[in-house]
Amino acid sequence: MRPDCTDFRQLFLDDVPMMDMRAPVEFAKGAFPGVVNLPLMNDQERQKVGTCYKQQGQAAAIALGHQLVSGTTKQARLEAWAAFAKAHPDGYLYCFRGGLRSQIVQGWLRDEAGIQYPRVKGGYKAMRTFLLETTQQAVEQCDFVLVGGLTGTGKTDVLHQLDNVLDLEGHANHRGSSFGKRATAQPAQIDFENQLAIDVLKKRARGIGQFVLEDEGRIVGSCTVPLELYQGMQHYPLVWLEDSFTNRVERILRDYVVNLSAEFKAVHGEEDGPRLFAERMLQSMANIYKRLGGERHQRLSEMLREALQEQQRSGAVDLHRGWIEGLLNEYYDPMYAYQRAAKAERIEFAGDAVEVREYLKARALREPRK
């Protein structure tokens, strides 16, 4: 039999298959990419056992657990665990602390299905701690540089051409702006942190010691950048991306209208997709009402509404340029100009997409890798 595992680094580097014995409510709060939730107890059973433990102690709680997970319920779950184990002979199982739940499942698999299947010692909690420490160590030991620029300059496009990027918006499934929500939901905060840490781990294992980040706020949609990383972002050097106003408008039109509306159709269907896209865009505009002021918000909202109606009627997106131009001129550009002035001392290079990309590639080569 393979031994139980304590090599968390290799588990994540190799994307080792794992099944999670925790209840669905625990899994939903935070898990690891690619892991399958095959719980020993469902949420209701876990709650009953927890109440019993508080009132009558461990022995009574264990007895109740065995009573709740018995007969056909136990058999169905055992079959699911056995199927996973057979499909993934190199995998592992775990529970919250690597204790009773995973040991019970291990025992049932061994005694009733004839399968010897190892567990992760320390369970979810130990692996989660390892990933938190991974991010912390990278902040302490690695070199970081930020890419900033006005809205629509294509910062994400440039980042995706680099092999040493940490894509905060990608991990958060959000574009980072008031209009940044995607057609699919954002991950739970813990999932966001875990995905980011695994990304760091894999890149450092490839010898990367310098990371490029987009210059973000602390909050990316509903996801919060880890505090130690965000604190570092307040003083990391900055590379400023520049592009013409016309190009920026066209890029925003592509990303936030053409591509996003197509994404809504793909996710929600031809009928509901356009309606939900329009609702999302109008809500995004409503979210910045206070920052725009009443008159400006009303004017830009009306332009957006007319553009959405024309898009739904004919498929044409030309009218969207009007509110995009207005929002850039009257809101985003003045805000970014103020932010750039505040960060001027940290800007070490400025240029267009090609120049910035080449600068960052050259910069990565001349910096020591850790």
From Swiss-Prot:
InterPro entries, per the entry: Rhodanese-like_dom (IPR001763), Rhodanese-like_dom_sf (IPR036873), SelU (IPR017582)
EC number in record: 2.9.1.3
The keyword Transferase is assigned to this record: yes
Keyword terms: Selenium, Transferase
Residue ranges constituting the Rhodanese domain according to the UniProt record: 12-136
Keyword DNA-binding found: no
Enzyme class: transferase
Source taxon at top rank: Bacteria
Active site: residue positions: 95 (s-selanylcysteine intermediate)
Signal peptide range: none
Catalytic activity: 5-methylaminomethyl-2-thiouridine(34) in tRNA + selenophosphate + (2E)-geranyl diphosphate + H2O + H(+) = 5-methylaminomethyl-2-selenouridine(34) in tRNA + (2E)-thiogeraniol + phosphate + diphosphate; 5-methylaminomethyl-2-thiouridine(34) in tRNA + (2E)-geranyl diphosphate = 5-methylaminomethyl-S-(2E)-geranyl-thiouridine(34) in tRNA + diphosphate; 5-methylaminomethyl-S-(2E)-geranyl-thiouridine(34) in tRNA + selenophosphate + H(+) = 5-methylaminomethyl-2-(Se-phospho)selenouridine(34) in tRNA + (2E)-thiogeraniol; 5-methylaminomethyl-2-(Se-phospho)selenouridine(34) in tRNA + H2O = 5-methylaminomethyl-2-selenouridine(34) in tRNA + phosphate
Gene Ontology MF, one: transferase activity, transferring alkyl or aryl (other than methyl) groups
Biological process according to GO: tRNA wobble uridine modification
Described function: Involved in the post-transcriptional modification of the uridine at the wobble position (U34) of tRNA(Lys), tRNA(Glu) and tRNA(Gln). Catalyzes the conversion of 2-thiouridine (S2U-RNA) to 2-selenouridine (Se2U-RNA). Acts in a two-step process involving geranylation of 2-thiouridine (S2U) to S-geranyl-2-thiouridine (geS2U) and subsequent selenation of the latter derivative to 2-selenouridine (Se2U) in the tRNA chain.
HAMAP family: tRNA_sel_U_synth (MF_01622)
Subunit description: Monomer.
UniProt family annotation: Belongs to the SelU family.
Name listed for the protein in its UniProt record: tRNA 2-selenouridine synthase
Species the sequence originates in: Pseudomonas putida (strain ATCC 700007 / DSM 6899 / JCM 31910 / BCRC 17059 / LMG 24140 / F1)
